[in-house]
Amino acid sequence: MAANYWASTQRKHWLFTRERLAEIRESFKEKDKASHTHFPLPDQRLLNIYFNQQLIKLGKRMSTRQQALATAQVYIKRYYTKNEIRNTNPYLVLTTAFYLACKMEECPQHIRFVVSEARALWPEFIVPDVSKVGECEFSLISEMQAQLIVHHPYRTLSELQPELSLTSDEVALAWSVINDHYLTDLSLLYPPHIIAVMAIIVAVVFKPSSQTAFHGSAAPIAGAMRDGGMNILAALSDKGGAGPPPRIQKLIAWLAESEVDIKAVIESTQELVSLYEVWEQYSEKNCKELLGRMIRSKSLDK
């Protein structure tokens, strides 16, 4: 899966502008206003958090590595740029994206095993018929035009670790930030190297204490990011300002020489801050109830 990102289908076909994503979602709403009225759903980022938590539960049951879960999240996002979520069974889409991602990331799971474990988690929404996952897999592949290779920021993070002399704590936090970016639209908006650089900046500026446990997410530093996020943005935007600490100065100097799109890095940081703000409203119970009501009312669980 180490093909060149710059020649990839991800770069050519699966990067959008914010305006284009908004147009796509608005078009879904215009086509079926009744469903949007009768079946209100939480903020997309809250749904992303819910889907991510469900994927983690499924992945843990089968000891799946993080990159396969990340690929599954990208597949789900891509699929929902082509399909209105209210016309689907999201649990089936999630299960199928997981199954397909495991194959693509070379850690395949048998379809019967995946269906069995998914049914153990969501028995009211996943039927025992494995052909349903097979049909959904065909739909996923078709909607993505068989463009299934996903380039992730994890690789860039690993490559930059020695160059930027990142500590193990900084790498762990940057990894967690990368995990969290899949809860936003960022994977549809920017190349993976932009996300990796953003994650490194966050990790260096908000260096975690040895007592901080991230458990795969950087949410524990949300408050610090909200309070200090604008200072980071100012430091990155204004190279001539009062000097930040030497560690951050070194990072800013590297950024200036690297020709990385700093505007994109800043926008990505702002998106992450926004995610952590909306996360405070997250309710797993609410997401589950609203999705369940929609699925049962529209008989999407059959």
From Swiss-Prot:
<dbReference type="InterPro" id="IPR013763">
    <property type="entry name" value="Cyclin-like_dom"/>
</dbReference>
<dbReference type="InterPro" id="IPR006671">
    <property type="entry name" value="Cyclin_N"/>
</dbReference>
<dbReference type="GO" id="GO:0016538">
    <property type="term" value="F:cyclin-dependent protein serine/threonine kinase regulator activity"/>
</dbReference>
<dbReference type="Pfam" id="PF00134">
    <property type="entry name" value="Cyclin_N"/>
</dbReference>
<dbReference type="InterPro" id="IPR036915">
    <property type="entry name" value="Cyclin-like_sf"/>
</dbReference>
<keyword id="KW-0539">Nucleus</keyword>
<dbReference type="GO" id="GO:0016592">
    <property type="term" value="C:mediator complex"/>
</dbReference>
<keyword id="KW-0678">Repressor</keyword>
<keyword id="KW-0195">Cyclin</keyword>
<keyword id="KW-0804">Transcription</keyword>
<comment type="function">
    <text>Component of the srb8-11 complex. The srb8-11 complex is a regulatory module of the Mediator complex which is itself involved in regulation of basal and activated RNA polymerase II-dependent transcription. The srb8-11 complex may be involved in the transcriptional repression of a subset of genes regulated by Mediator. It may inhibit the association of the Mediator complex with RNA polymerase II to form the holoenzyme complex. The srb8-11 complex phosphorylates the C-terminal domain (CTD) of the largest subunit of RNA polymerase II.</text>
</comment>
<comment type="subunit">
    <text>Component of the srb8-11 complex, a regulatory module of the Mediator complex.</text>
</comment>
<feature type="domain" description="Cyclin N-terminal">
    <location>
        <begin position="53"/>
        <end position="142"/>
    </location>
</feature>
<dbReference type="InterPro" id="IPR043198">
    <property type="entry name" value="Cyclin/Ssn8"/>
</dbReference>
<keyword id="KW-0010">Activator</keyword>
<dbReference type="GO" id="GO:0005634">
    <property type="term" value="C:nucleus"/>
</dbReference>
<comment type="similarity">
    <text>Belongs to the cyclin family. Cyclin C subfamily.</text>
</comment>
<dbReference type="GO" id="GO:0045944">
    <property type="term" value="P:positive regulation of transcription by RNA polymerase II"/>
</dbReference>
<keyword id="KW-0805">Transcription regulation</keyword>
<protein>
    <recommendedName>
        <fullName>RNA polymerase II holoenzyme cyclin-like subunit</fullName>
    </recommendedName>
</protein>
